[in-house]
Structures are given as structure tokens and as C-alpha cells.
């Protein structure tokens, strides 16, 4: 008897209010870290009806022109007309950034050159063989749809689209393997002139059928395109946006646990971000090496402490090696101190704006060092000893 179930993940476009906030926070981080690699940055952004507020804590000698940075991000996303609910030229930009507490900094920057964790916390990484990039299929497909929504809007293939949008994909699994798409939900902001019928047909033909892998498509997929019937008011005019509210979209679509820490606006001394990247790096290399088909990795840290307080590996009964053996391998092959992660993944670079929409994982860009599988041979060698 087949074990059959549905699993669902969602994604949002770069014009979604929460993603706007993430992108502004990461643009501020990139501006500062490009000029000061020793900077400590924790940047939070709020976008709402007609205004943007940037807040958080910094420790840097760099002056960051917050207004210019925020307006450029909003312009690039496509909020270039007040009719869209937000305009980069007329929106107010407020700066409420303060200085980082010296109580925090004393535990992070150490005289011996090591770096203590910027906070306590637990972070997860995940990898599986459902896609070429070793990501779960539902979140992979959901990101493809939202990315295509933005591209078709920007290249004028579908000129009636506006920046805000979301996707959701339900995948049918049989015996723990994806076999088909069951349901697709797409909600996209649009101009008031376009009819619901034309919008639905265009989105299905120009996006779904041109983007998604044909082996998962079939005639009985259930489509819900703008199921409320109209989505003209969107972006920050429709909903306030905040940094760090799309942590499941940013990661694995719910396929593995999440420690709760957001990524955007945080420099890599914050293990919420850097250790989550390291956990993905570990999980992906374990799967790429062939020692397992699926891996969930948990790392945990204490503020000011160099070494992780725990390392956990779960291969979901897909490995002949025990968790204890795999954890021993991980500790031998990977550098999991904050400094070790930063150096091995080369994280002191202005790369974070690239991460802030369409997922931090599963996109094999040159800048995404945590997506490399260059440790797979070392893992194989460890188990041959």
C-alpha cells in the first residue's frame, strides 16, 4: 500500500511588504560591510502606507545614507508609481538606528582574535534529493513561480502585474517521494483594468506552464489565481511589512524545523544567520557525499561562547551510519565556530541583498558559498578510514 500525502510550501515576491523590509535591511548591511568588515549590524525595517522606518543597532565608523539606500531598493523592486500603493520618490524614510550595546559587543569581539556567538540560539539546515539543488520540491517550485511573476512583470510580458504577490504549491508524495503537483495558489497584485479571466489564463500559460517542470504537471491540477477575485491594493498600502517575518519562505518551506531567528539585516557574527548557512552547508554536503539521502542538522550556540554547545544530525533513516558517527564527522570536517564559519564561507562580503528574496538556500549563485558541495569528498574519506 502506498503511503500518500500532500505537503505545501509558499513563497512571496520581492514586492511583498515583508520582503521589501528584508531587502532594505540587507541593502543597509551590504553598504556597511563593503566599507567596514568589522562592523556589527542589526538592521530592522518597517514599511507601511507611504513610509519606511529603519531601526536597529550598529557598531561602525561608516555613515550609511539610509534614505538613498531604501529608495534605491524600492525603485529596483518596482514601486515607481503612487498608483501601485507606494512610490520610492514620495515615501517618507525615517532613520531610528542606534548604537550596539557594549554589553553585547564585549562577548563577540575577543582579544585572542576569536569571535564569540552574537547571541544564544538554535539553527537548522536541511538537504534532500528531491531537486538538483538538494532542496525540498514544494519550496523550490513556489520560488520559481514568484520569481517568474517578477520577471514577467519587469520584462512587460504581463504588463498588468504589479509588485506584490505570493505563491503556494501542494505536492503529492508517494512513499516519501514527490510524484505530482496537486494544487497551485497564486495571488498577484494587478492593474484595475485587467479582467480576472484574462489574468488567470495569462498567469497559468505564461508562468506555470513555462516555468514548472513538466514531469510534475498534469491536467487535474487545481488552480487558484487571485481567489478573492481582485488584488489591486497591495504592497505596503495593503499590509505593513517587517524584517524577519518570512523565515519559512527564506528557508525550507516548513520541511524541517526552524530555530526562530531571522536572517536579513544581520552581519555574520549573528549566528542566527551565519550558523543557519553553515547548517545548510553541512546538510547539503552530507547528502552530496552519498552518506545519506536526507539530512537535518541542528547547531546551537551561547552568547559570547566560541564553540557550538551542540551539534545534531538526523538522516531520517536514510543512512547506514549512526547520528553519533555523523556528528563526529561533521565536527572533524567543518569549522563551526563563528569565526570558522565566517572564514570558510567568506561571509564578510556585500552579498546579502542577493539572499533577501526567493530563498537563502537552493540557489547556486557564485556568492552563495554555503551551497557548494566541496566538502563531499572529505566526508567520504572520513568514513573510509
From Swiss-Prot:
<keyword id="KW-0067">ATP-binding</keyword>
<dbReference type="Pfam" id="PF00438">
    <property type="entry name" value="S-AdoMet_synt_N"/>
</dbReference>
<keyword id="KW-0554">One-carbon metabolism</keyword>
<comment type="function">
    <text>Catalyzes the formation of S-adenosylmethionine (AdoMet) from methionine and ATP. The overall synthetic reaction is composed of two sequential steps, AdoMet formation and the subsequent tripolyphosphate hydrolysis which occurs prior to release of AdoMet from the enzyme.</text>
</comment>
<keyword id="KW-0963">Cytoplasm</keyword>
<feature type="binding site" description="in other chain">
    <location>
        <begin position="230"/>
        <end position="231"/>
    </location>
    <ligand>
        <name>ATP</name>
    </ligand>
</feature>
<keyword id="KW-0630">Potassium</keyword>
<feature type="binding site">
    <location>
        <position position="18"/>
    </location>
    <ligand>
        <name>Mg(2+)</name>
    </ligand>
</feature>
<feature type="binding site" description="in other chain">
    <location>
        <position position="100"/>
    </location>
    <ligand>
        <name>L-methionine</name>
    </ligand>
</feature>
<comment type="subunit">
    <text>Homotetramer; dimer of dimers.</text>
</comment>
<keyword id="KW-0460">Magnesium</keyword>
<dbReference type="Pfam" id="PF02772">
    <property type="entry name" value="S-AdoMet_synt_M"/>
</dbReference>
<dbReference type="Pfam" id="PF02773">
    <property type="entry name" value="S-AdoMet_synt_C"/>
</dbReference>
<feature type="binding site" description="in other chain">
    <location>
        <position position="270"/>
    </location>
    <ligand>
        <name>L-methionine</name>
    </ligand>
</feature>
<feature type="binding site">
    <location>
        <position position="262"/>
    </location>
    <ligand>
        <name>ATP</name>
    </ligand>
</feature>
<feature type="binding site" description="in other chain">
    <location>
        <begin position="164"/>
        <end position="166"/>
    </location>
    <ligand>
        <name>ATP</name>
    </ligand>
</feature>
<feature type="binding site" description="in other chain">
    <location>
        <begin position="245"/>
        <end position="246"/>
    </location>
    <ligand>
        <name>ATP</name>
    </ligand>
</feature>
<dbReference type="GO" id="GO:0000287">
    <property type="term" value="F:magnesium ion binding"/>
</dbReference>
<feature type="binding site" description="in other chain">
    <location>
        <position position="16"/>
    </location>
    <ligand>
        <name>ATP</name>
    </ligand>
</feature>
<keyword id="KW-0808">Transferase</keyword>
<dbReference type="InterPro" id="IPR022636">
    <property type="entry name" value="S-AdoMet_synthetase_sfam"/>
</dbReference>
<dbReference type="InterPro" id="IPR022630">
    <property type="entry name" value="S-AdoMet_synt_C"/>
</dbReference>
<comment type="similarity">
    <text>Belongs to the AdoMet synthase family.</text>
</comment>
<dbReference type="GO" id="GO:0006556">
    <property type="term" value="P:S-adenosylmethionine biosynthetic process"/>
</dbReference>
<dbReference type="GO" id="GO:0005737">
    <property type="term" value="C:cytoplasm"/>
</dbReference>
<feature type="binding site">
    <location>
        <position position="44"/>
    </location>
    <ligand>
        <name>K(+)</name>
    </ligand>
</feature>
<dbReference type="GO" id="GO:0005524">
    <property type="term" value="F:ATP binding"/>
</dbReference>
<dbReference type="InterPro" id="IPR022629">
    <property type="entry name" value="S-AdoMet_synt_central"/>
</dbReference>
<keyword id="KW-0479">Metal-binding</keyword>
<feature type="binding site" description="in other chain">
    <location>
        <position position="57"/>
    </location>
    <ligand>
        <name>L-methionine</name>
    </ligand>
</feature>
<protein>
    <recommendedName>
        <fullName>S-adenosylmethionine synthase</fullName>
        <ecNumber>2.5.1.6</ecNumber>
    </recommendedName>
</protein>
<dbReference type="GO" id="GO:0006730">
    <property type="term" value="P:one-carbon metabolic process"/>
</dbReference>
<feature type="region of interest" description="Flexible loop">
    <location>
        <begin position="100"/>
        <end position="110"/>
    </location>
</feature>
<dbReference type="GO" id="GO:0004478">
    <property type="term" value="F:methionine adenosyltransferase activity"/>
</dbReference>
<keyword id="KW-0547">Nucleotide-binding</keyword>
<comment type="pathway">
    <text>Amino-acid biosynthesis; S-adenosyl-L-methionine biosynthesis; S-adenosyl-L-methionine from L-methionine: step 1/1.</text>
</comment>
<feature type="binding site">
    <location>
        <position position="239"/>
    </location>
    <ligand>
        <name>ATP</name>
    </ligand>
</feature>
<dbReference type="InterPro" id="IPR002133">
    <property type="entry name" value="S-AdoMet_synthetase"/>
</dbReference>
<dbReference type="InterPro" id="IPR022628">
    <property type="entry name" value="S-AdoMet_synt_N"/>
</dbReference>
<feature type="binding site">
    <location>
        <position position="239"/>
    </location>
    <ligand>
        <name>L-methionine</name>
    </ligand>
</feature>
<feature type="binding site">
    <location>
        <position position="266"/>
    </location>
    <ligand>
        <name>ATP</name>
    </ligand>
</feature>
<dbReference type="InterPro" id="IPR022631">
    <property type="entry name" value="ADOMET_SYNTHASE_CS"/>
</dbReference>
